Amino acid sequence: GRDPYETELRILDTYWSDHCRHTTFTTVLTSIRVDESFMRAELEESLELYHKIRRELGRDEKPLCLMDLATIGARYLRKIGKLDDLEVSEENNACSIFVDVDVDGQPEKWLLQFKNETHNHPTEIEPFGGASTCLGGAIRDPLSGRSYVYQAMRVTGAGDIYQPVGETLAGKLPQRVISRKAAAGYSSYGNQIGLATTHVREIYHPDYVAKRLEVGAVVGAVKAENVRRETPAAGDVVLLLGGRTGRDGIGGATGSSKEHNTKSLETCSSEVQKGNAPEERKLERLFRRPEVTRLIKKSNDFGAGGVSVAIGELADGLDINLDAVPKKYDGLDGTELAISESQERMAVALAPEDVDAFIALAHEENLEATPVAVVTEEPRVRMHWRGDTIVDVSREFLASNGAPKHAAVAVPAPADESFAESACDRAFEATSELTDPVVDAVCDADSLEVSLAALMGDINRASNKGLVERFDSTIGAATVLMPFGGARQLTPALAMVAKLPVLGGKTTTVSGLSWGFNPYLSSYDPYAGAYMAVLDSVAKLVATGFERANMYLTFQEYFEKLRQDPERWGKPMAAVLGALMAQIDFGVGAIGGKDSMSGSFEDLDVPPTLVSFATAIGNIDRITSPELKEAGDNLIWVSFEDALASSVCATFDAVEHLIGAGIVRACASGAYGGLAETLVKAAVGNGLGITGDEDIDMGQLFEPAYGTFVIELAAGEDAQSVVTRLEDAGLDANVDVVELGQVTSAYELTCDGQVADLAVVQEAWERGGGLESVFPYRTSPEERAAAETVPAISFEGEAAPAYHGPALLGDTSGAPRVVIPVFPGNNCEYDSAAAFERAGAVPTVYVVNNLTPDAVAESTAELARLIRASQIVMIPGGFSGGDEPDGSAKFITAFFRAPEVTEAVRDLLQARDGLMLGICNGFQA
């Protein structure tokens, strides 16, 4: 034997980290003890079901671990005939399912891919960079699967953002600073790359002061025939594509696997990666080209671990030439090149004969592509630097993840002593038993208006519009549901919905993504909290118009550092067990997830966190929003007769049927704040009110309402007609339909003989107990008054002069030609081209290349030629050159000052009566 090289030690430290290899979730559980309680029998029954499933699947000889528990639900559902659309391949960077997409009235087979990602550690250290690369990393996972990412969601957790700065814990940034800068970072990256972030929610819980929760979830899609899945063979070449390599992010994977202490803020800053959204936008453009993706045998994105992981995972045997890795600057040694986590890089494995063609296609998209490795027959990973072999390890050893780890588990007893007959019953029992000071105070109040204002002013129920409006929700022109609905844009959407990214055609196919999680319930009972997270995420999609049969889940687990404490291990054990029971009960499987198991700071721990994300494919004609639509419509409450999973499923099926029948004008799933929270949020969007039915008393308004639905019916429908419809469809068993009242034009809520002024409630909701002071969005009365007094601008003059230019060039239809130049940082060229196509023009999208001086000269000449062959120049928006130096569009204007381009533009505008348009950066140019 020999002593290991330094680079080998650093690679093993990275490769075997909890972040990269889920070592906590794969730790072998040697014993599981359930503490004595009224719930012991139910928990033990859940464990017995898990063991039964293991036996049915032939997995009883596999190590018993959290990873097995987290993934076995989907395995079981697939075995019994569900989840048939799941794509199974060697590439598993993102969840991937086959879906049928309507393209111009014809079905096409596509892959829908989705992924959630956390950047808790880097965001806690450097909020802007950590949050921005959270989104960048999330995008690259489906992107490596060849999908075009078109939707993003952000769910975060913070401590007390009102805490005075002087009371901040030593070694910590103020919570308000983290929240603001993280929002700026995430939104900056999304806005630059051109990704619509249509659902944003921040959760507040005092225990997130231990370490922030920063989750990004994205959805992408690609036509299935454009994706090639093959195992790389000996002799295949690995290209490094995209950004160059620097020292940023070194140690990020290992740092993310550690708990924090008072020194972390000072010692971990270099572990935070530096995002470069315009570079990743180029990768998105390249991977959207079928002639590119059909060359790729296998792809992996550069995230944690850099070269050692991204390339190291592509094949069993690899010879990697670190000298070939493009560098941001000189001075990097072999170890740094091997484990740097510089962003916006992709590794692709190609057949040798395809390398030159791929590099040429990459250059067309202004991207560098460099051969850096060769696949070998021998299963060893070797890295060479400056003539020396600095890594030479066997695949078997690398894949071992180090010595096996073992732990004992003690599942804690629930805080209450209530009896439950099933997992579902337990989840509802825990929800009702949970003490909520806000709800308790509300229930003690005599005034309905005071109660509603107090409830809606709570920070976790209040409007977060000031935060949401920092994110671009419309880029890509595919958004179906805006973040806030109604004429007043105030009712929060329950899920994000967008059309699939079909180029050159029309589609009615949409995807949806929702989430569920309550940190207070999960802290009270992790088992019930996880179960209810799944239920809530599914209910939100049902209310939005999707069908449970088409739904899939992915989980985000985030827990304290478990150490060797059985009680600490019991929390994720209980949560993942609860989530498993929910999957089995509702027939919806989790086919992906991300675990982060280092949420501790000194003696502080994050709350037990299992966020459930639910996604589905559907048709735009079924999409339903929660805001009330019209006065005079009847409102019903669809619930279940008992807290059994079969009854909840029956309720889901009933709502799906009613939406499909076309009689639902608005639908909202119930919230922890009860009917009161649901009704107020539904009312504010259009400024409508509710007159409650005489059978509804005030106490019912504030009871938790998870899994239930408030529905506004179409004209002529009421509770009785709904019951008849459900009976005729055989869907009425165990479903409870209650008349809630009517929608009114008066902006007030009437219930139990009391009247609440919803304007007063809305004001409390928008103030959010001070949340508006952190994320303001409303203008002051003085500003509104000034805006209302601005005089109207009108123009009266001669008609536009007649067109005197030459005959229009192009096809026989005489359609005008449009050139759309794409500069580094532009991001709405697809939207612009589609708009011109709809108007009858013929657009040409041209990517400006600035990789070398010769490339700039060639781009200058080509753009000038295209302008002379066109009647319109359209400069798309975005963030060209990162809007630097000194503001927007400087790079674009500099390029247009080139003599050839200037002369072509002058000829277009002055000699040929052509047009020049711009949006965002393009308008500024």
Question: Model regions: which residues?
Answer:
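Glycine/proline-enriched, intrinsically flexible loops and inter-domain linkers
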Residues: 1-881, 895-906
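Cysteine-nucleophile active-site neighborhood
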Residues: 880-925
